[in-house]
Every structure is written in structure tokens, then in C-alpha cells.
Regions:
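Bacterial N-terminal signal peptides that target proteins for export
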Residues: 2-15
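Bacterial N-terminal signal peptides
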Residues: 13-23
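Sec/Tat signal peptide C-region and signal peptidase I cleavage site
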Residues: 24-28
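Carbohydrate-interacting regions of secretory-pathway proteins
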Residues: 29-429
Length: 429
């Protein structure tokens, strides 16, 4: 009896030891919590392990898409499609390190998108937001291009095959995106598999030669919501956390080089060209609206430029604008117009119209047929303009504050317009 009891005691002791070890391991691997060091370093959770607080539908106010919480994980039910099933954060992020664990079902397809811009004109988030691709390559039913595989910057940059160590479906992987003022890194299970610089000439060439050639605003935003994708396959996510990085301001940018239109895109059939070191905009035979827009976004900035109205001077400088379709550019316009028509005022295109016009007594500040100096300062929801050293407007507007986009020069419709520009110089804020 003693022998049997001793054996039983030893067995119980072993089981207790194993249970204790398992318990310690579980505690050590507690999910959806931050360590003291992570908190001190500025990390924050985007998922609390219990609820979907902080998330909502893309372009929505509440969450109705196919997502739920199961056993401390966000799960995509697999009911989504290319056109639906997107869940986004209720906050925007600019520069950051984003880390998360993910697990796919057999043949699964999902993704993590960032810098997603929400507008009624955009039915799906991938029109604007870059995507870290997640896919079960060995079991996916269709042939995949390299830019469609796990870890890719979807339809843009492919990961280094020699560094790929993705675990099979049903097992957890960890991924990380670093976005630091245009420098981008993709990580997978502790290894850096991809890095590139956004918004360079090479980046724009790649963007305009592939899938995104017909998506003019893809990847341009410096700030946006983070998005999870249900692409019709169950997928699980946990330990979603982010550390925000500082913006590098004070960058000096010469928007026009005096030689060509590098860094700009023209929309419409009106004429934009360089002559004698000047940027010229001139009405074409169609006599329609025309725009010359920067390829890159500038949200907070201080811009100075000079313009001269050589013919009808109905033009303008758009701020935080975007290409909606064809030659339609949407945004806010700092007016450039003949005397008596509010040069320096702010007009919202395809929206509320005039937000602020200039007093009649300030109309004589414009020098028609001569060079004028305009300054535009945009910071948050505040816009200030100056003409020839005199302040014209100072306005705060919440809708402008939520905007983001390009700088664009405009030719008004009606024909007979010719305006020349020079010394377009910008400082980021």
C-alpha cells in the first residue's frame, strides 16, 4: 500500500508540476495586453481582447460587417467579399509601428490596410490604402502572382523570398508594418522581408504602371484609418498594437523646378506647359475646367508662390484636394481671379461654395497684369492667406481640418484664360 501510495503521490506531483508549467506559460503568453515596458515606450492596443470597441464599418459609424470576438481573438466570419467586409479603426494614424498576430483558414485570404481614406466616392478601402497581404498560398485555389503573396505590399512591392518564414494555415504568425515619414518596412515572424520608400519617382512609376494606374489617389495619403479585410475566408487576429512615431516637419519643397512639369499630373484637356522658366496655364479648345495637381499630398504646409494674370485671370490654388473622376478635382480653392472677384478667398468646390470672401476694400491689393505674391498657410483646421504681404483671410473650418490631399492649380471653364506662375515653394508643418 505504501508503494502504491508513493507512486500515486509522485504521479499527482508530476501532473501538478505540468499544470503549473502550463499555467505559467499561459500567463507568460497573455494576449491582448501590454507589458510595462511597452506602455512606457508608447505602445497602445487597438483590440482589448473582449470587444470591438474602437472599430467600425468602412465609411460607416457603427460595426455591422462580419466580425466578432471569439476566445480573445477578432475573427472574420468569412462572409465578406471584394466589395464588403471591411472593418476600420475609429482613429487615423500617420507614422507608426503596427504589430499583430494572425491565423488563416485553409486557402484563406485577408489583409491589413493602412492610410485608408474614407470618402463617399470610394466604395472600397484599397482604392486609397496600401495593403500588407495575408494569404494561404499553398492552398489558395488560384494561381498567385508574387505581388499577391503573403507579406507583399499588395500589387506594388514583393517580399524577399529568402527571408520568408510563414507558418501554415491554422498556426499563428506575427506581422509588423513600419511607416516612418515615407520609409516603409514589412516584417514577418521577426524578420524584415520588405522595405521601400513611398512617394519617390520610382514609387510613382510603379503605381502608375500596374493595378493602381486607374486609382489616382492610391497610396498618397500621409494619414488614414487602419483596416482589416474579410475576403470571404475565416481569419483570426490578436495582439493588435501600435506605436505612433513623430512627424518630421520643416521640409523645404520646390514644387516647380522651372524646367518641366515633373512632380505634377494634368487633368483635363486645357494647356499646361513651361516657357522661359515659367509655368503657364492656358485655356484649350475645349474651354473646360483643367487642373495641374501635385503627385504627392501636402496636408499641413506654408506655401508661397507668384502669379501673373496675362489674360482673363480666373484660376485658383486648390488645397487638400483629390481627383474624383476624370478631370473633376474636389477640395478647397484659394481664389485667383480678376479684380472684384475675391482673390485670396476660400471656396469649396462641389460643396458649400464660398466659405469666406474678402472685403471690397481689399480688392485693390491685387495687381492685374503684374506679378503678385500669394502665401497660403494650412495647419489643422486653420487656413490663412496673404496677397502681396496683406492678410486676406483667416478661417477655421472642421471640414477642412478633416481633409487631406494634393495642391492643384486650376483653369476655370469658359476659355480665354492665361495665368503664369513661378517660385512655388513650400515648407511642411
Amino acid at each position: 500500500m505504501y508503494f502504491r501510495g508513493t507512486t500515486f503521490s509522485k504521479r499527482v506531483s508530476v501532473l501538478l508540476a505540468v499544470a503549473l508549467l502550463v499555467g505559467v506559460e499561459c500567463m507568460a503568453q497573455k494576449h491582448n495586453v501590454l507589458t510595462a515596458k511597452e506602455k512606457a515606450d508608447g505602445w497602445e492596443l487597438l483590440f482589448d481582447g473582449k470587444t470591438l470597441n474602437g472599430w467600425r464599418d468602412y465609411n460607416g459609424k457603427t460595426l455591422t460587417e462580419p466580425w466578432h470576438v471569439v476566445d480573445g481573438c477578432i475573427q472574420a466570419k468569412g462572409d465578406g467579399s471584394d466589395a464588403s467586409g471591411y472593418m476600420v479603426t475609429d482613429r487615423e494614424f500617420e507614422n507608426f509601428i503596427l504589430s499583430w498576430d494572425w491565423k488563416l483558414s485553409k486557402g484563406g485570404n485577408s489583409g491589413m490596410l493602412y492610410h485608408v481614406v474614407e470618402r463617399p466616392q470610394y466604395a472600397v478601402p484599397y482604392i486609397t490604402g496600401p495593403e500588407y497581404q495575408l494569404i494561404d498560398e499553398p492552398n489558395f485555389p488560384e494561381k498567385l502572382e508574387e505581388w499577391q503573396k503573403t507579406g507583399a505590399d499588395y500589387a506594388m512591392h514583393v517580399p524577399d523570398k529568402s527571408k520568408m518564414n510563414v507558418r501554415p494555415y491554422g498556426e499563428w504568425n506575427n506581422s509588423r508594418i513600419v511607416f516612418d515619414n515615407g520609409h516603409v518596412e514589412h516584417w514577418l515572424n521577426g524578420k524584415k522581408i520588405l522595405e521601400f520608400e513611398a512617394w519617390t519617382d520610382e514609387w510613382h512609376k510603379l503605381k502608375n504602371s500596374g493595378k493602381w494606374a486607374t486609382a489616382p489617389e492610391y497610396g498618397l495619403a500621409h494619414k488614414g484609418v487602419i483596416c482589416l479585410q474579410d475576403h470571404g475566408y475565416p481569419a483570426s487576429f490578436r495582439n493588435i498594437k501600435i506605436k505612433q512615431l513623430p512627424r518630421k516637419s520643416g521640409k523645404q519643397v520646390t514644387l516647380f523646378n522651372g524646367k518641366n512639369l515633373d512632380g505634377w499630373d494634368a487633368y483635363g484637356t486645357e494647356r499646361w506647359y513651361v516657357e522661359d522658366g515659367l509655368l503657364v496655364c492656358e485655356s484649350g479648345p475645349d474651354k473646360q475646367y483643367g487642373y495641374l495637381a501635385t503627385r504627392n499630398y501636402y496636408d499641413d504646409f506654408d506655401l508661397t508662390l507668384e502669379f501673373k494674370q496675362e489674360a482673363d485671370g480666373n484660376s485658383g490654388v486648390f488645397i487638400r484636394s483629390f481627383v474624383e473622376e476624370g478631370a473633376k478635382v474636389n477640395g478647397w480653392q484659394v481664389e485667383v481671379a480678376p479684380k472684384g472677384y475675391d482673390t485670396g478667398g476660400i471656396y469649396e468646390s462641389y460643396g458649400r461654395g464660398w466659405l469666406i470672401q474678402i472685403p471690397d476694400e481689399r480688392e485693390n491689393i491685387l495687381k492685374e497684369g503684374e506679378w503678385n505674391t500669394m502665401r497660403i498657410r494650412v495647419k489643422g483646421d486653420n487656413v490663412q492667406t496673404w496677397l502681396n504681404g496683406e492678410q486676406m483671410v483667416n478661417i477655421n473650418d472642421a471640414k477642412i481640418g478633416a481633409g487631406k490631399g494634393r495642391i492643384a492649380l486650376q483653369i476655370h471653364d469658359g476659355g480665354g484664360i492665361k495665368v503664369v506662375w513661378r517660385n512655388l515653394k513650400l515648407t511642411t508643418l
